[in-house]
Amino acid sequence: MNLASVLLLLAACHLSVSVNGQEHKEAIELSMANHDHVLGSAQVVFVAFCADWCPFSRRLKPIFEESARVFHQENPQASAVWAIVDSQRQADIGDKYFVNKYPTMKVFVNGELITKEYRSTRSVEALTNFVKFQLSTAINEFSSQDQLNQEMDKSKRNVVAWLKKDGPEFANLKKVASILREDCSFWVPTDHFGTQTNDNKLSFFDPDSNEEAKFTGNFNDYDFVKQWVTDKCIPLVREVTFENVEELTEEGMPFLIYFRDPDNKTTDKVFGEAVARELYDQRSAINPLLADGHKFAHPLKHLGKTKEDLPVLAIDSFQHMYLFPDMTQMNIPGKLREFVMDLHSGKLHKDFHENLDQRMIELAKAKAARGITDDHEAQAPSTRPIDTTPPPSVFKELKPSDKRYSILQKSEL
């Protein structure tokens, strides 16, 4: 073989290595053809759903691509893939994951979709730090029972497991912890401390009841373990905050909101028990939430209420807000369910219009008595426009901003 042939062969080999290396160092295009392979190819797969017609997508794409390059330069051995979906050409993928705005960034861990999207700063530093966090361990270690008692925040949801770290049971727990790391804190003993027991144990510690729930199923059944931990870590009734309200609105279900005094949460449990008792089968139709009545004073104002009236229960349908008429009846069997079912049947809206004048008079009196003013204060109920409706939704205004996203199907929110 002459020198020219050798040089040509070396150049071809170098090109091949470079191309293969680029698969992992740059953002790749995710399609239905490579979907399963890509999602299963790394511990973390970070996906940006973009559309060329969307100005926010056009701004994000070069930042996302640069983030992928920077991340892999700094972390060449990391098990992570950055991928971009051209949502015009690959609409099926967007439909598969219910993408209704662009850009949307989702993360998959061990091939499974994490519920919470990435919604933070769109910068190289922020994006790379996010992927590093997803790759970091989601499990805390303790070397003694005293250390666990001192470091475990009992105001949060905690899962404590005693499992051999070289077994499939621990591998299952690691996968579950990676998915639910933002919903629960996970704890395992150090290798030395863990040898004090030979039995597999998994417990959940409820911050509300201070009770311990023990897992009694098959530790090798990943789906069963995941479902058990998920049911414990994601409660039936959640707290709505300004930080999570955007993602809650995207779940698309009307809010059943229990506004209460943040310094007096004694009735939280009462509300939770009422929801579990009467609305458990409505989990896919209503979103029961707790809200700080001081921070969310604006929705209360729309209902003619102030912090002096707390607790207050209302439904926000993303079109209108409906007030639970008598808080003393919340624990009467059937009343809470009736309130929710009346929303679904349209009865709440119908009843409001049938008694419109009287309700507007009552609302005006309530606002006047509490010194609440709004844009309509000078109008007598009889002079209101004929299409006057229940108080408009406030939480709809907290949905994803059209200053950051191109929103699809706006009428559904």
From Swiss-Prot:
Q: Name one Pfam family in it.
A: Thioredoxin_6
Report which residue ranges the record marks as coiled coil: none
Fetch the CDD domains from UniProt: PDI_a_ERp44 (cd02996), PDI_b'_ERp44 (cd03072), PDI_b_ERp44 (cd03070)
Q: According to the UniProt record, where is the region Disordered?
A: 367-413
State any GO CC term. Answer: endoplasmic reticulum-Golgi intermediate compartment
- Where does the motif Prevents secretion from ER lie? 410-413
Q: Which cysteines are joined by disulfide bonds?
A: C184-C233
Q: Which UniProt keywords apply?
A: Disulfide bond, Endoplasmic reticulum, Glycoprotein, Signal
> Which InterPro entries does UniProt cross-reference here?
ERP44 (IPR052643), ERp44_PDI_b (IPR041870), Thioredoxin-like_sf (IPR036249), Thioredoxin_domain (IPR013766)
Occurrences of domain Thioredoxin (ranges): 22-136
Where does the record locate the signal sequence feature? 1-21
Question: What SUPFAM superfamilies has UniProt attached to this entry?
Answer: Thioredoxin-like (SSF52833)
Q: Which GO terms describe its molecular function?
A: protein disulfide isomerase activity
Q: Which GO terms describe its biological process?
A: protein folding
Per the record, where are the segments of Basic and acidic residues compositional bias?
A: 396-413
Report residues carrying sugar chains. N264
- Gene3D superfamilies, A to Z: Glutaredoxin (3.40.30.10)
Subcellular localization: Endoplasmic reticulum lumen
Domain comment (free text):
The thioredoxin domain lacks the 2 redox-active Cys. This strongly suggests that it lacks thioredoxin activity.
This one is known as Endoplasmic reticulum resident protein 44.2
* Organism (species): Caenorhabditis elegans
Q: What is the lineage of its organism?
A: Eukaryota, Metazoa, Ecdysozoa, Nematoda, Chromadorea
Primary gene name: erp-44.2
